[in-house]
A protein has these predicted regions:
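Short alpha-helix C-terminal cap/hinge motif
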Residues: 2-8, 12-36, 44
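Short, well-ordered beta-strand segments
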Residues: 5-11, 54, 78, 102, ...
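A late-sequence structural motif
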Residues: 18, 158-208
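A ligand-binding cleft/hinge motif common to bilobed small-molecule-binding domains
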Residues: 55-65, 126-155
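Flexible hinge/capping segments at coil-to-helix
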Residues: 67-75, 79-101
Length: 227
C-alpha cells in the first residue's frame, strides 16, 4: 500500500468491479486503485512492489507468493459470423482440425496438443490475432472473457467443450499479508463483514435477557370479616 491506497492489478478479461464495490462499502478509509496489467507483466510488477495484490492467470511462478485459485474460464473459438462453426451451439477440438489457428505471443492457454494447423504468422498480441480472424485468415481460441473484451460486430464465438481452460487466481507476496490483504481475501471469497476472519469485525456485546415477570394474580384479595 502506498499514499493511503491499496493497489490491485488485474489481467485483461477479469472484471473486478463487483469486488471493488464491496471494498468501497467496507474499507472507506482506504481507496482501492485498480490497474489493468498485461498477463506477462503482472507477476514481475507484484514482486517489485508495484502493486499490493493481483488477479492473475494461472499457472504462475509461485516463489515467494501466496496464490488462491478462484475460478475457471470457459474456452471459446472466435470466428467470422459467416464461418461454418457459427452454425453450431458448441464445438469440439476435432471440429477445428482443418482450421488455421492463430497463436499470439501473449497466449494464455496451455496446450499439450494444439488443434488445427498453425496459422501463417504469430501475432504479437491477442488484439492483433482478432484483427486477422476478422480478415478471414484463421480462427483463435481463448478464454471467453477475452473474447468479450475484444468483441467485434463481424465476429462471434462458440464454446469449445474439450479445450483446456484458463484459471484466475488472487496473488500477493508471502511477506506482506496485511490486514487490508485479509480484507480483500474475505471480499473475494464472499465472507460477510462480521466473519471471524475479517479484518476487525465489530462484535456486539451479548445482552442478557431480563428475567421473566410473573403475571399479576387476577384474584382480588379477600376482605377480612369483622368479628
Amino acid at each position: 500500500m502506498t499514499d493511503g491506497e491499496f493497489r490491485l492489478a488485474y489481467v485483461p478479461g477479469v472484471t473486478p468491479g463487483k469486488w471493488a464495490g464491496v471494498w468501497a462499502e467496507r474499507v472507506r478509509e482506504v481507496p482501492l486503485r485498480l490497474l489493468q496489467i498485461p498477463a506477462t507483466e503482472v507477476v514481475p510488477l507484484l514482486r517489485n512492489g508495484g502493486v499490493d495484490a493481483a488477479f492473475v492467470r494461472l499457472p504462475v511462478d509461485r516463489e515467494a507468493l501466496h496464490v488462491i485459485p478462484l475460478y475457471l474460464e470457459t474456452t471459446v473459438v472466435v470466428v467470422p459470423k459467416d464461418h461454418a462453426v457459427a452454425a453450431a451451439e458448441e464445438v469440439e477440438l476435432a471440429d477445428l482440425a482443418d482450421e488455421d489457428v492463430f497463436e499470439p505471443l501473449d497466449e494464455v492457454l496451455t496446450w499439450d496438443d494444439r488443434p488445427g494447423k498453425p496459422a501463417f504468422t504469430r501475432p504479437e498480441s491477442t488484439a492483433g490475432a482478432i484483427e486477422l480472424v476478422a480478415s478471414g485468415a484463421g480462427v483463435l481460441l481463448l478464454p471467453q472473457s477475452l473474447a468479450r473484451l475484444h468483441h467485434r460486430k463481424d465476429l462471434t464465438y462458440r464454446t469449445v467443450t474439450d479445450a483446456p481452460q484458463s484459471q484466475i487466481g488472487l496473488a500477493w507476496l508471502e511477506a506482506v499479508t496485511t490486514d487490508l490483504m485479509e480484507e480483500l481475501i474475505g471480499i473475494v471469497r464472499g465472507r460477510t463483514p462480521n466473519s471471524s476472519r475479517g479484518r476487525n469485525p465489530q462484535q456486539q456485546p451479548t445482552r442478557k435477557k431480563p428475567p421473566k415477570q410473573r403475571p399479576a394474580s387476577k384474584h382480588r384479595p379477600q376482605k377480612r370479616r369483622r368479628r
